[in-house]
Amino acid sequence: MIEKSISKKNIFFIFSLFVFSFIINQYYGNKGVFPLDTFLHFDNGYRVLIGEIPFRDYWSVSGPTVDYIQSIFFYFLGANWNAYVFHSSFINGLTTIFTFFVLKNFNLKINYCFLYSLLFSILAYPPSGTPFVDHHSALFSLLGVYSFLLFLKKKNKLYCLLIPFFLGLAFFSKQVPATYIIFSILLGLAIYSYKEKTFEYINYFLISLLIFIFLVLIFGKLQGIKFSDFLNQYILYPQTIGTERFTNLNFTFNGVIAHFKFIYLLFVPLIYVQYKKNIESKKYLKGTEFVIPLILILL
């Protein structure tokens, strides 16, 4: 009876979180628009809907994931504004539920899981409201991080297999921040495998990665996308933009430290807890428990 009531409570929380996260993004998605950014994927999603292909029929620097997903929403709901915002609201609801699931698996009290997930839903997609590559890339990357954390916690190979798919969707939404997250998780996976003295999990990761790459190549072939077009538009051309921005970076104390001081302050309690655990147990750094906070710091 107790387990049944807990299960019903979980279902109620999940349903409430999805509805709230969906509605709040719908609200902010209809508050206003940016002349260029807001309509970018409305146009591209419609172009995919009528048969045009990214890279082949139109220049795509930001990544095709958002365009293809948006075309699905347009197909079922019609090419209208509500269908456009439904897309980002659905992603907001999906990542909110995943957040709740992850927190619950780390044995946080269910009321706290609900509260933190609720706060997450307010900060995840509503700042944009409408579908945008930065948010898709960040949130798909977050799902990849969630899968990695659950893999470390549960030792379930399924989560290890999911990581490349989420990170792949993130990369094909936008190259950054997905690339940074990919390297951080690869480092964490390498450290974990070294500590466990096994490459079994790396093998699962690589198998899943190869499957994802194979599916992407097949999809690109069926869509008639030339690899040279993809390489020029999505890999080489963005590097020219990145090079220009990198040369304009302000490598001063204010530019590197002071400007991000509140982000760095968040690391202080995390680093302190790890230091304290290392003092209490000299075996802490020799185990695998510290990999989770290490990944969080690297992110």
Q: Predicted segment positions?
A:
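Specific aromatic-rich, kink-prone transmembrane helix
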Residues: F98-F101, S137-K154, Y159-L167, L186-A190
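Membrane-interface transmembrane helices that cradle and orient dolichyl/undecaprenyl
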Residues: K104-N107, G144-C160, A170, K195-E196, ...
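Extracytoplasmic catalytic/substrate-binding loops of multi-pass membrane glycan-assembly enzymes
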Residues: Y28-N44, P54-I72, A79-N82, Q223-F227
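Short acidic/glycine- and proline-prone juxtamembrane loop motifs at membrane-interface regions
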Residues: P127-S137
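Membrane-lumen/periplasm interface segments of specific transmembrane helices
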Residues: I202-R245, V256-F262, P269
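Transmembrane-helix signature of polytopic, membrane-embedded enzymes
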Residues: L94-I122
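Membrane-interface alpha helices of multi-pass inner-membrane proteins
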Residues: L158-P177, I181-L186, L294-L299
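Perimembrane helix-loop-helix junctions
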Residues: L167, Y180-I213, K277-I279
